[in-house]
Design a protein with these regions (language model features):
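Short, small-residue-biased leader/transition segments that mark boundaries at the very start
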Residues: 1-6
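Active-site Tyr-X3-Lys motif and surrounding loop/helix of classical short-chain dehydrogenase/reductase
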Residues: 8-15
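Hydrophobic positions on the long internal alpha-helix
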Residues: 24-28, 32, 67-68
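Short connector loops in the HATPase_c
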Residues: 33-35, 77, 126
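Catalytic loop of short-chain dehydrogenase/reductase
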Residues: 38-63, 68-77, 89
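Hydrophobic structural elements of the Rossmann-like NAD(P)H-binding subdomain
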Residues: 40, 82-85, 95
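C-terminal helical subdomain
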Residues: 84, 92, 101-137
Length: 137
């Protein structure tokens, strides 16, 4: 839980999951403005409900969604679209490290997430959270 987390771990999670996203958006802005481009960020189901032992992680994922929605409104009049992908449990090295080996048929594959992201990029959506669920693939 939070009481057992080192300050360094808190800062690292916030730096990667929140500040990293903010800095990417800020640095990309001039290019996005010139090209009417778009940004896609990734969240997790933890954004909808805080998870025990994941308070910092969950709160940064919630911040991701709010940041995406705010930027979509802020930059929409410039033709810049900003969205968020929320993949269900996906087989990744980080997931395996945190949860161990899980049955293959219960996890999304990275390619599923990539295909859904590509479909989002060719859509006209902005300010949306796109849920990718195994049963929908």
């Amino acid at each position: 839980g939070l009481g057992d987390v080192y300050k360094r771990q808190i800062e690292e999670t916030i730096d990667i999951n929140y500040k990293g996203m903010v800095h990417v958006a800020k640095e990309a802005y001039p290019y996005l403005e010139k090209s009417c481009g778009q940004l896609v960020f990734y969240t997790s189901s933890s954004y909808t409900r805080g998870r025990m032992n994941y308070s910092i992680y969950s709160s940064t994922k919630c911040a991701t969604v709010n940041f995406v929605q705010a930027l979509a409104e802020e930059w929409g009049s410039l033709g810049i679209r900003v969205n968020c992908v929320n993949p269900e449990r996906t087989k990744t090295p980080m997931r395996t490290k945190n949860f161990g080996i899980e049955p293959e048929d219960t996890l999304l594959k990275s390619m599923d997430v990539a295909v859904a992201t590509a479909k989002l990029l060719v859509s006209d959506l902005t300010g949306q959270v796109i849920d990718i669920k195994l049963k929908l693939i």
